[in-house]
Curated annotation (Swiss-Prot):
Belongs to the trans-sulfuration enzymes family. The modification N6-(pyridoxal phosphate)lysine is found at residue 212. GO terms for biological process: cysteine biosynthetic process; cysteine biosynthetic process via cystathionine; hydrogen sulfide biosynthetic process; lipid metabolic process; negative regulation of apoptotic process; positive regulation of canonical NF-kappaB signal transduction; positive regulation of NF-kappaB transcription factor activity; protein sulfhydration. Pathway: Amino-acid biosynthesis; L-cysteine biosynthesis; L-cysteine from L-homocysteine and L-serine: step 2/2. This is Cystathionine gamma-lyase. Coiled coil: none annotated. Homotetramer. Interacts with CALM in a calcium-dependent manner. The keyword Amino-acid biosynthesis applies. Keywords: Amino-acid biosynthesis, Calmodulin-binding, Cysteine biosynthesis, Cytoplasm, Lipid metabolism, Lyase, Pyridoxal phosphate. Catalyzes the last step in the trans-sulfuration pathway from L-methionine to L-cysteine in a pyridoxal-5'-phosphate (PLP)-dependent manner, which consists on cleaving the L,L-cystathionine molecule into L-cysteine, ammonia and 2-oxobutanoate. Part of the L-cysteine derived from the trans-sulfuration pathway is utilized for biosynthesis of the ubiquitous antioxidant glutathione. Besides its role in the conversion of L-cystathionine into L-cysteine, it utilizes L-cysteine and L-homocysteine as substrates (at much lower rates than L,L-cystathionine) to produce hydrogen sulfide (H2S).
Amino acid sequence: MQEKDASSQGFLPHFQHFATQAIHVGQEPEQWTSRAVVPLISLSTTFKQAAPGQHSGFEYSRSGNPTRNCLEKAVAALDGAKYCLAFASGLAATVTITHLLKAGDQIICMDDVYGGTNRYFRQVASEFGLKISFVDCSKIKLLEAAITPETKLVWIETPTNPVLKMIDIEACAHIVHKRGDIILVVDNTFMSPYFQRPLALGADICMCSATKYMNGHSDVVMGLVSVNCERLHNRLRFLQNSLGAVPSPLDCYLCNRGLKTLHVRMEKHFKNGMAVAQFLESNPGVEKVIYPGLPSHPQHELAKRQCTGCTGMITFYIKGTLQHAEIFLKNLKLFTLAESLGGFESLVELPAIMTHASVPKNDRDVLGISDTLIRLSVGLEDEKDLLEDLDQALKAAHPPSGSHD
């Protein structure tokens, strides 16, 4: 169920009990003999057995860990899922999911996707006999046309990284599930479960890089995978243990702590993100702004129908050339030039040279990932300070006098 929120601006109402679940699910003090209110960091690699093969739920920390267990239970609740599994990184989660397949199987992947995902599918998974097809899944007819008898997995992001296309998850699920043997995976990194729940819209797997909004403090690298299907969960749990790409107990503790403020942080990201997007849209030095929260976004109505709001991820084209983009980036004072996103601090990057440099140039050109495309991860700073920083950097790139021409 969901509850209404006055700030939703036409988006879906927020999911009911979200904050309460983030704070309490999996955190019960009764699970510890000390009755600790904050879950413990269980660093032990092994656990005593009462007799050979008789244990209390934990044998070896790769197979299962009490701290990781707390995190997985909490995330499952937030994703509206029965099960969650934590991994050492978002790409570790991607690799593990891919191991559900065998040589000869086809993966259909959204063409505009995280550079690391593109690189893994194109340069690694393909070397092991998997067939990879990159398709614009925002166009449902193209997705349907790409499905073959060998198709076993469809991988989408929404919004996409970095050009922020919205994909209709429900429509994709309808097409994909006409066959009973295709898995639909949605990378929910850019939205988090606070703003979007892919499983409720028909996805089989919801994954994310918890490095980003879920942890929210730029000090943990982690991936999360949530599912409702018991059979799928059992297969992934086996692979999690067999491949061994699990996070450390300390990282699980930190991410679990980050979840407690997720609802508060996401509201602020939305507020600041909207303010920055509106400012950029009115700035003469900006060619185009891409933000699903703006009415100008071509899929704004889909965003309102599918999400409870938007995050702080904004993409825009600065007028001019790479030189103008570089001057803008050099003059920013609050926005840090760095890869990654979703932390409390504001970040800025140039995808063509940074996060998406591994994507072939021809593909970047088709997708619109040009030298003047800039990606912002708007943080939690004071709105006025962020706008002033962007304003002065844009003026440096495009002086009002026009002396740079």
